[in-house]
Amino acid sequence: MLNERDFDLIFDSYDFKHEGKVHLSNFLPIINDLQLLHPASAPPLLSEFQKQCTLEFVRQNADLSITKDNFRDVYKKLTENEDDSFANQAEKPSMEQQNSKNSIKEDANEHSVNSAHSKSSSNASPESLNPSQMMSKRLSLPPMSQFTDSDFVNILRTPFAQSTPLNRNTSSRNTEMPLVRKDKPDFSNGHHDLIKQITELQDMLDKARDQARKKSRTVDILEGKVNELTHQLNMADSKYNESKVANNSQNNQIKTLKAQNLNIHKNFQKIQSELIQTNSGLYSTKKELSALQVRYATLLRKFTDQTKKIEELSLAASRSSENENTIRRLALENHELKNSNNQLNNHIDDLTREKHLIALSNNPKGDEFLSPSNLDEMVYSKEVGLSFTQPSVCISIPAVGMRESEELRELEFKCKQQKKTIEECKHISQSLQSSLTAESSRNKELVAGFLMLSEEIGIQKWIIQSLSKMSPTLNDFCRRYDSSMPTYEESSHECTVLSSFSDDETGLMATNTTMNNSSKDFMASQDTVNADNPHFLATKGQPLLLLSVMKSNILRLFYVLFLFACFYGLDYILCAELLQAFLRVVFTFCEHIIILLYGRYELVQPS
């Protein structure tokens, strides 16, 4: 053996199960593999006799296993080496060859001196014995002469030679000589030089046979290794092809995943840009909504003030209705007094005629004194009484005329005052009616504006919900939007509050049926705005209403275009965004123009 590393490698090659031990039948193949690693000039690790002894021992103990340490111990016992390593075996001199040469020389000398047959190697002295003979004596084994060539036929091969059948080189085996030489023939003393030549040739022949045997064995081992390596190479090639196919499939999957990742990243950037735009739009709508809320609060305050004024006017109207009743009662009394006055005048005329006739009958000469002019002065004078014969008549008539005239004056004064109050009440009712119509038109404008605002908020909410369905990352944004923005129910509640206020107005107007005959038209529904206030819709409300409707329709159209553009790339989305921004600018410009044309505070602008 060269070193411990080679021994460990060869031993592990026979340890198929990696148990740290091999079968005892693998002892000689391991020795042969180690021998192949030695140079050709190095002595063999085991002699033929030692190999034969080992083979017999293996046959007797075929079921045993041996470890590395046991392997070293057995080898030490066979070679009588006390060192722990096998590396020093190569440095020992080839004692076996020298002893064999010495024994041959000694045998030749003995034959030459005694002219008899040479002694057997078994009868030689201990000094002249070779290591194999000494080993046989020590182990009490039969000598090598008893073994023939047939005993060495079943020599174990290497595991490579056993595992794969190889084309063996039989040319050297056909000329193979027996491993153990037979007993040397006796030579005469005259053939000493010939014996030397024969021994040298025999040694050369043995070396050549050993080298040929080693070469054939190395060829067998190498062929087995080549076959095993070709088998492993084929397996590795198949595995390489499989791994190549798997790698190609994995590369294709990686490419598809990269493409999907790029698409997802692009979609994420698109959605992020859309979110930023929607966030900016929502921020602007929030600002507009806050401004509308402030304006709504101010309008609500004004509306409450107007309702208070309307209540006061309704109280005044109720009082004026009471005054009208008193006026009617006083007018009836005046009419009755006029009738009574006429009756009294007729009665006075009758009395004057009777007295005139009486005076004519009593004083026929007093025509001048009793002329009609004098009689009239006497009758209609309120300070001087008539000189009648009957004093009761002369006293009672002037008194009745004075009372009636005073009452008539008082009644005329009261009638004038009542007429003035009636005219004032009519004027107040007309102003109240005009203010109520103006407030009702403004309330209708507010209701229409808030309805359009709620509709646009609902559209924006629907767009955001649909976008959130497309991307799950928008759910938190939708929740924040729902919590921050007023819902459609709140806006509808505001509209119902406004409609309730308008209903209260109509109820207040309906109480004064005598002063406002057009309250039935104001009690109509909000769908008949054109019939209630056609001037407003013709001049102010109709452009703003058409603009808001157009705006909501274009928002729906842009949402459909956005969904269509999501499937055809980024260029369509950029064009749609630019067009949408341009139209927003145009709509805001139109709104500002409408505000400047029709007044800033007369129109309610939807967001």
Curated annotation (Swiss-Prot):
Entry's localization field: Cytoplasm, Cytoskeleton, Microtubule organizing center, Spindle pole body
Residue numbers spanned by region Disordered: 83-135
Keyword entries, A-Z: Cell cycle, Cell division, Cytoplasm, Cytoskeleton, Meiosis
Low complexity bias (residue ranges): 111-132
Keyword Cell cycle part of the UniProt annotation: yes
BP GO terms, sorted: cell division; DNA double-strand break attachment to nuclear envelope; meiotic telomere clustering
Keyword Cell inner membrane: no
Record note on disruption phenotype: Cells show a distorted structure of the meiotic prophase nucleus but are able to complete mitosis successfully.
GO cellular component, one term: cytoplasm
Chief location bin: cytoplasm
Biological role stated in the UniProt entry: Has a role in karyogamy, recombination and segregation during meiosis. Although it has been shown to associate with the spindle pole body it is unlikely to be involved in its formation or maintenance.
Subunit structure: Interacts with mcp1 and sad1.
Identification of the protein by name: Karyogamy meiotic segregation protein 1
Species this protein is from: Schizosaccharomyces pombe (strain 972 / ATCC 24843)
Lineage: Eukaryota, Fungi, Dikarya, Ascomycota, Taphrinomycotina
Gene: kms1
